[in-house]
Amino acid sequence: MIYVTGDCHGNFRRFQSDYFPEQANMTKDDTVIITGDFGGVWFGDSRDDETLDWLERLPFTLVFVCGNHENYDALERYPVDDWHCGKVHRIRPHVLHLTRGQIFELEGHRFFTMGGAKSHDIEDGILEPDAPDFERRLTMLQRKPRARYRVNHISWWAQELPSDEEYAEARRSLDAVGWQVDYIITHCAPTSIALMGSRHNEADRLTDFLQEVRERAKYHYWLFGHYHDNKAIDEKHILLWEQIVRII
């Protein structure tokens, strides 16, 4: 069995048995995929352990692509391992980060993964904690109603968008299978879908790359998160947030 759900932001209440009773019939051979903004690796130290250990005790294997609200510095410290023909960061034995540009073979189906998204809650800037005026700027923003800012390497990371090498890895992976997969798992959507949503959405390098994938690849379903809604865009593209849906 394979299920997919959307952004968690470190809140995993949906995986309690009262909310996800289907897990009673699942084993570690079954998989639940989170479409980004996992948030379980946030502090990068022992403060994450209680939550991660609880996730490891769940009866299924939990995997996720990265979103734009992840501690990338901490994620990158985990060992890279091979899993079902692709590369993962192994957070716990059965809690895995599906890295970008990979194709995983799960239950006889190909899954292409390309996590990440551009943050749009940074209109008031990204603060540098080592800057001499950091405290002054932070105090000013804290006094501003509904200020939208982040702090570099504390609440925002440049790695939220893929590197040149990750784009190249994605192209190599897709070339190797003739751009034919069964499922695509991303955090944000292709440009044509992203622009259908909020006025804050705009095209960027990642959404444009995903638009190319949409136009070139052959696939059955594309599941993504980021936009905090549960919605079928059309017969192939599914936006997920709190819902947990079975796909296999």
Model-inferred region functions:
Residues 8-9, 38-39, 68-71, 117-118, ...:
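Catalytic metal-binding/acid-base residues of hydrolase active sites
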Residues 5, 11-106, 199, 203-211, ...:
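Core catalytic region of metal-dependent phosphoesterases/phosphodiesterases
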Residues 43, 73, 122, 194-195, ...:
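Generic domain-boundary/flexible-linker signal
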Residues 2-4, 33-34, 184, 223:
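Residue-level marker for buried hydrophobic side chains located in beta-strands
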Residues 1-4, 8-14, 134, 147:
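Acidic, histidine-bearing metal-coordination/catalytic regions of metal-dependent phosphoesterases
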Residues 158-248:
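Internal alpha/beta domain cores that form substrate/cofactor-binding pockets in large enzymes
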Residues 93, 107-200:
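Active-site-proximal loop/helix segment associated with metal-binding centers of metalloenzymes
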Residues 1-3, 102-113, 183, 234-238:
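Beta-strand-turn-beta hairpins that frame and shape the catalytic cleft
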